[in-house]
Curated annotation (Swiss-Prot):
Name recorded for this polypeptide: Integration host factor subunit beta
HAMAP family: IHF_beta (MF_00381)
Organism placement in taxonomy: Bacteria, Pseudomonadati, Pseudomonadota, Alphaproteobacteria, Rhodobacterales
Annotated keywords: DNA recombination, DNA-binding, Transcription, Transcription regulation, Translation regulation
A Pfam match: Bac_DNA_binding
């Protein structure tokens, strides 16, 4: 499912909301999650999961084409840990 399909699904299930309102809500939710992660905050959606930022150390990698050693700088990456309810639904418990 892509963002536009999510917006359409929510709009279809909530006829009192226009598609433009739903789009604004979905975009705001995503933007707030992104801003919180950029500040280094953790975002927890109970039952669904938690978004956080993890630090990756610098390392020596390899260029797959040439096999040459390449320095990979340290960086921050987004991380998602699933919640128990989501795991249980995926595993049909």
């Amino acid at each position: 499912m892509i963002r536009s399909e999510l917006i359409q699904k929510i709009a279809d299930e909530n006829p009192h909301l226009t598609q433009r309102h739903v789009e604004r809500i979905v975009n705001t939710v995503f933007e707030e999650i992104i801003e919180a992660l950029a500040r280094g905050d953790r975002v927890e959606l109970r039952g669904f999961g938690a978004f956080s930022v993890k630090a990756r150390d610098a390392r020596v990698g390899r260029n797959p084409r040439t096999g040459e050693a390449v320095e990979v700088e340290d960086k921050k990456v987004p991380f998602f840990k699933t919640g128990k309810l989501l795991r249980d639904r995926l595993n049909a418990k």
